[in-house]
UniProtKB/Swiss-Prot annotation:
Active-site residue list: H42, H149
Domain of life: Eukaryota
Disulphide bond pairs: C64-C118, C82-C133, C89-C96
Signal peptide range: 1-27
EC code(s) of this entry: 3.1.27.-
Gene3D superfamilies referenced in this protein's UniProt entry, alphabetically: Ribonuclease A-like domain (3.10.130.10)
Keyword Signal in record: yes
Keyword Hydrolase applies: yes
UniProt GO MF annotations: endonuclease activity; nucleic acid binding; RNA nuclease activity
Keywords: Disulfide bond, Endonuclease, Hydrolase, Nuclease, Secreted, Signal
Protein name per UniProt: Ribonuclease 8
Organism: Pongo pygmaeus
Length: 154
């Protein structure tokens, strides 16, 4: 009887571990719309050092995010990207849009540490980006479409 119980508990712990591992590091907080979360994660009109900027993001998940890109633009500028022609996203949805041209951005890549002591290296560049856009949700600005996901840097 005891070995069967031990096997059951081990299986339960394994399943629990797999379930916890599936929670994405960039999971959107429940009290934010997708657009608000994009603004929190990726909008930074005035560049900041990655180590301090990433602390503001990592506190939501209490994990070190591996990679993050900050766009040094106002939300209104990124929202105008949603007015460019639709293109396919990495996930094959057709709600992505490419920026009008290169934009100033910073890429932060995790180099070491465990939360809350995450350490990042930064890379500054000017490059176009692709963002996914959707109709606004309650609490979003009143644009016809709002950016909800930074799909990639081109």
């Amino acid at each position: 009887m005891a070995p069967a119980r031990a096997g059951c508990c081990a299986l339960l712990l394994l399943l629990l571990g797999l379930w916890v591992a599936e929670i994405p590091v960039s999971a959107k907080p429940k009290d934010m719309t997708s657009s608000q979360w994009l603004k929190t994660q990726h909008m930074q009109p005035s560049p900041q050092a990655c180590n301090s900027a990433m602390n503001n993001i990592n506190k939501y998940t209490e994990q070190c995010k591996d990679l993050n890109t900050f766009l040094h633009e106002l939300f209104s500028s990124v929202a105008t990207t949603c007015q460019t022609p639709n293109i396919a996203c990495k996930n094959s949805r057709k709600n992505c849009h490419q920026s009008h041209g290169p934009m100033s951005l910073t890429m932060c890549e995790l180099t070491s540490g465990k939360y809350p002591n995450c350490r990042y290296k930064e890379k500054h560049l000017n490059a176009p980006y692709i963002a996914a856009c959707d109709p606004p949700q309650q609490g979003d600005p009143g644009y016809p479409l709002v950016p909800v996901h930074l799909d990639k840097v081109v």
